[in-house]
Amino acid sequence: MAPRIAMVAGEASGDLLASHLIRAIRARVPDAEFFGIGGPKMQAEGFDARWPCELLAVHGYVDALKRYRELSGIRKKLLKQVRRERPDAFIGVDAPDFNLWLEGKIKAAGIPAIHFVSPSIWAWRGGRIKRIARSVTRMLCMFPFEPELYERAGVPVSYVGHPLADVFPLEPDRAAARERLDIAPERKVVALLPGSRQSEVRNLGELFIETAAMLAQRHPDVLFLVPLATRETRELFSAALARNKGDELPLRMLFGHAVDAMTAADAVLVASGTASLEAALLKRPMVITYRMGKWQYRLMKRMAYLPWIGLPNILCREGLVPELVQDDATPPKLADALERWLVDPAACAALTERFTALHHSLRQNTAEKAAAAVLPYLSSSASCQPVSVSA
């Protein structure tokens, strides 16, 4: 009988991650079947999506509260199906607020519940690890310091590395990126990444534009690249430019192309998030910044454990790149921090060395290692050839 795996992936990033995992499992167990909540990339791998993963996309606490009844209903319906169909295993990909409850119920029903992508318990709300220990059969972690946290709590855990480290080259081709973007090799370039969400562009757009204007006064030859992934964020940034007379800035908006923009840049101004990790894997000097509502910032600060918010600093356990958050996020301070990377090649070279070491530590062939951690829970695992993985 073919092994069956139920899965839930939240949002587009989870859809991509899960699709790679499905492919890696199928390479070892060709007749494996998958069903649950997923997106188009999972469906392209033969996944039976009973609900689309876009339904799980919530933006902030207010949206989550408004949609609680809808999401709770979907979760209960899926749980009923899993209990009835009894797959060999369940894999929750990210979306911890949705998946951990589900995983606890599924584990209690005697079905292995695996969670792929550890919640950021090392950054805030560390008490969640008790709930995780009750809810999951195994945790698959992306960062090398995470397994120790789970081992101390008695949670079976596997370190699988980060998929971006597999995708990004160890030595980015800056010249090729500049050629694709039609930028002269000798020109100074700063990439501005104010975030992927509309709320982030609203909060940070004008700040980034004012910072660019200040830096352009000091370095008239600089070119600013602003990659924006959606029409909505592009319109918001264009409106901010118009309000701040940004038409005179040497600035080019790109539709997507964030990786090319960062690869081509001498320095990056980036909102805290996954983009900061991408910049580190591309070995780019950066300044990390963020602004949010005052009450939200106070709440986050009270619940946080680490002195840093950016993944590069957290992963290196050191303040390698400047972080200017909330009241410290001002155009003069941001311009000063960016300028350092434009005029100090020795500091940039030292940073490249540290980021290269980080890249090596995260490059683990994530999909294969994750698949190897899942295979022992499948009914046909005895007949497949798992890739060796350290737990």
Curated annotation (Swiss-Prot):
What GO molecular functions are on record for this protein?
Answer: lipid-A-disaccharide synthase activity; phospholipid binding
Pfam families noted in UniProt = LpxB (PF02684)
* Entry keyword set: Glycosyltransferase, Lipid A biosynthesis, Lipid biosynthesis, Lipid metabolism, Transferase
Q: Which GO terms describe its cellular component?
A: membrane
Q: Does the keyword Glycosyltransferase apply?
A: yes
One biological process term from GO is: lipid A biosynthetic process
- Pathway of this protein? Bacterial outer membrane biogenesis; LPS lipid A biosynthesis
User: For this protein, what is the EC number?
Assistant: 2.4.1.182
Q: What InterPro entries does UniProt report for this protein, alphabetically?
A: Glyco_trans_19
Which PANTHER family would you find in this protein's record?
LIPID-A-DISACCHARIDE SYNTHASE, LIPID-A-DISACCHARIDE SYNTHASE, MITOCHONDRIAL-RELATED
- Protein function: Condensation of UDP-2,3-diacylglucosamine and 2,3-diacylglucosamine-1-phosphate to form lipid A disaccharide, a precursor of lipid A, a phosphorylated glycolipid that anchors the lipopolysaccharide to the outer membrane of the cell.
By sequence similarity, the record places it as follows: Belongs to the LpxB family.
- Protein name listed in UniProt: Lipid-A-disaccharide synthase
**Source lineage:** Bacteria, Pseudomonadati, Pseudomonadota, Betaproteobacteria, Rhodocyclales
